[in-house]
């Protein structure tokens, strides 16, 4: 990437810091996850949860959501100004599952947001620790990416369900900051921009007045984030056009959809981070592990190591397959929903199957489900190897735009060849090359046509043994090319409904 000099590393974004060296970054990321762990321990104490109840992923999610809600200032302000029946704007809560007489029971808890904020700050040396909050948002987003399909959202904005591999981070809240922007896929950014443009088309005051000025700044900022994800000059130039448009309308929507399609072959750079549930960090802190002193990284061996030694439970519905539930959570932990299944399977050491074949629904349990009929199971979150998380989109060389990997957005920096039928994708480009962006469109299509399926992504990069923490001996796996590796084939997952 040409602009590497001006970019901050994830960990800097993650911790809001200025330029830091590797040791400082590891320490500040360690401080962040340590704070989450301390907060979680304190909440388990407040709620008098047993060790097993504290390791239940459903309880973890409830507690994470409570603290995120307690710090959601915009929504809190909105709730206070528009009081709705039966909702106390000053309180937050959710379902906590407890073990009673050999059965699981659901208990709804309610806490003052002020109290939750106090506990959170206390666990984070008196600071607001926004980085830790963002970290939990990204974990929830990664879980949603692995659990739900976004076909409906894609179709609503005029995009094609085949673009689902571009939708990483599509459920992240807007307030997730730079660390959140880094992990959003090209499709997610395009969708946010299209929604904005559509509002502008329908509401003439959207771009006007003082509010409109702020809207415009947000629009341009989002355009710049998306531009930064593209790796070819022509794609970047088209983004400049979209950003500079006087009043954005259908022409811009067309351009954005074209760009999203082009990203299926000329992949954008999207960051990947292993964000784990709070119930993993908590017990580690409780056992005396000092994350800040030892240092921690979201993109190296640390999360794999932590999961090797963690025990996490999950409630399981009567007809669900515990192994499938484990796969879902494993993928979420490593942000691997869009990774090639061949690569994930190799790293995990057990076969990772497409979502259409999973006998499991989401991790969260709806309020109308009968918990007493449910059992709990230990999630198998260990791996056979570890690999470095990537932010490149899988392009072989940055000099000339080569093909990224189709229908997946690579998570792990591991050599693989590209199993794709370029014909199927190029078929989506029978579109027009007229209009003001014609030369750029022609250039992009030319690049896509010259992308060779036999190219290899991440040349020479491999996976590592879990004992090889310095990543000295890469093992380059060889993959069977006959089967395409997308998680979304034969998809029958539920839609994500907010």
Curated annotation (Swiss-Prot):
Of the GO CC terms on this record, one is: viral nucleocapsid
One MF term in the entry's GO annotations:
RNA binding
Q: Which family does it belong to?
A: Belongs to the influenza viruses nucleoprotein family.
Principal place where this protein is found? virion
* PTM comment, free text: Late in virus-infected cells, may be cleaved from a 56-kDa protein to a 53-kDa protein by a cellular caspase. This cleavage might be a marker for the onset of apoptosis in infected cells or have a specific function in virus host interaction.
Main function: Encapsidates the negative strand viral RNA, protecting it from nucleases. The encapsidated genomic RNA is termed the ribonucleoprotein (RNP) and serves as template for transcription and replication. The RNP needs to be localized in the host nucleus to start an infectious cycle, but is too large to diffuse through the nuclear pore complex. NP comprises at least 2 nuclear localization signals that are responsible for the active RNP import into the nucleus through cellular importin alpha/beta pathway.
Q: For the region Disordered, what residue ranges are annotated?
A: 1-21
Output this protein's name: Nucleoprotein
Subcellular location(s): the record lists:
Virion; Host nucleus
């Amino acid at each position: 990437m040409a602009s590497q000099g001006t970019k901050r590393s994830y960990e800097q974004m993650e911790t809001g810091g200025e330029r830091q060296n590797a040791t400082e970054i590891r320490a500040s990321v360690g401080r962040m996850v340590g704070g989450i762990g301390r907060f979680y321990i304190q909440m388990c104490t407040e709620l008098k949860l047993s060790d097993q109840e504290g390791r239940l992923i459903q309880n973890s999610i409830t507690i994470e959501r409570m603290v995120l809600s307690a710090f959601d200032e915009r929504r809190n302000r909105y709730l206070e100004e528009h009081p709705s029946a039966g909702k106390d704007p000053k309180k937050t809560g959710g379902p906590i599952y407890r073990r009673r007489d050999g059965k699981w029971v659901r208990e709804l808890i309610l806490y003052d947001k002020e109290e939750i904020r106090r506990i959170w700050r206390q666990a984070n040396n008196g600071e607001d620790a926004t980085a830790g909050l963002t970290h939990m948002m990204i974990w929830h987003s990664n879980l949603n990416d692995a659990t739900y399909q976004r076909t409906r959202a894609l179709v609503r904005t005029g995009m094609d369900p085949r673009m689902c591999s571009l939708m990483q981070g599509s459920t992240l809240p807007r307030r997730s900051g730079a660390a959140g922007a880094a992990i959003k896929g090209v499709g997610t950014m395009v969708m946010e921009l299209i929604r904005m443009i559509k509002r502008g088309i329908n509401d003439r005051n959207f771009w006007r007045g003082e509010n409109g000025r702020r809207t415009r700044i947000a629009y341009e900022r989002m355009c710049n984030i998306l531009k930064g994800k593209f790796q070819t000059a022509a794609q970047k130039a088209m983004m400049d056009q979209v950003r500079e448009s006087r009043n954005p309308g259908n022409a811009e929507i067309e351009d954005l959809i074209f760009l999203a399609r082009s990203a299926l072959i000329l992949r954008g750079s999207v960051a990947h981070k292993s964000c784990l549930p709070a119930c993993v960090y908590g017990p580690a802190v409780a056992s005396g592990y000092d994350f800040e002193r030892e240092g921690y990284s979201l993109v190296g061996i640390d999360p794999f190591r932590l999961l090797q030694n963690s025990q996490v439970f999950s409630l399981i519905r009567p007809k669900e397959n515990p192994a499938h539930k484990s796969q879902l959570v494993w993928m979420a932990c490593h942000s691997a929903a869009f990774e090639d299944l061949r690569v994930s399977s190799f790293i995990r050491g057990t076969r990772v199957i497409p979502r259409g074949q999973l006998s499991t629904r989401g991790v969260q349990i709806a309020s109308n489900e009968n918990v007493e009929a449910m059992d709990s199971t230990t999630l198998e979150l260990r791996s056979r190897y570890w690999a470095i998380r990537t932010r490149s989109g899988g392009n072989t060389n940055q000099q000339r735009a080569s093909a990224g990997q189709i229908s997946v957005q690579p998570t792990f920096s591991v050599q693989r060849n590209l199993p794709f039928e370029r014909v199927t994708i190029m078929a989506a480009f029978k579109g027009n090359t007229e209009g003001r962006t014609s030369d750029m469109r022609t250039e992009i299509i030319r690049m896509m046509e010259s992308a060779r399926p036999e190219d290899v992504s991440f040349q020479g990069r491999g996976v590592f043994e879990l004992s090889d923490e310095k990543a000295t001996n890469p093992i380059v796996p060889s993959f069977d090319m006959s089967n395409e590796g997308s998680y979304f084939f034969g998809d029958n997952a539920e839609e994500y409904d907010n």
